[in-house]
Amino acid sequence: LALATVELQKMSEPKLAINEIFYSIQGESTWSGLPCAFVRLKGCPLRCHYCDTSYAFSEGLKRSVTSIVEEVSKLDTRLVEITGGEPLIQPHVHTLMEALLDKGYEVLIETSGERDISLCDKRIHRIVDIKTPASGAADSFLETNYDDLRLNDEVKFVIMNKDDFDWALETTKSQQLIGRVRAVHFSPVMEQAGNS
């Protein structure tokens, strides 16, 4: 009976569309080099030219928050990154954040800033990937998110060319990001062959 009750609770609790959960070494941000559990959520409204996770646009299964936390607990790390796609498009992502934080995990969320980041739990580390002009999604950033950036956050610009670099540098200066956030990252990406 107790097992049936637990299963009923799992069925009625909030669910998220999960693309994958995996263990790897953190490759970006100031946590680079550390073991990390990644929870990749399904879906993204953007179509950045350099996207390397387009499989997350449509592939994924609905899972309860409890089952996600249970799977993460089997991985040998206390660092978790919620990513996508764009994780903030799923309303129950906040329930997942809180569940992981309440279990004592250090939680990162990588977001494009296309949605309101102020709704995130204040204990979380937000990695805000501000889209540059060459991404094809530069107009997607919610301008009010600049006002909500804090020292717990990091900002990332994926740089495809010199114009992107200049734009990111100007944005860093005009938004006074240095000193307002934990770190600002300029991450170069190779352009398509023949366009360098």
What are these regions, as identified by a protein language model?
Residues 11-35:
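Short, charged low-complexity linear segments at domain edges
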Residues 12-13, 44-46, 71-74, 143-147, ...:
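Short amphipathic alpha-helical segments, especially helix-boundary/capping motifs
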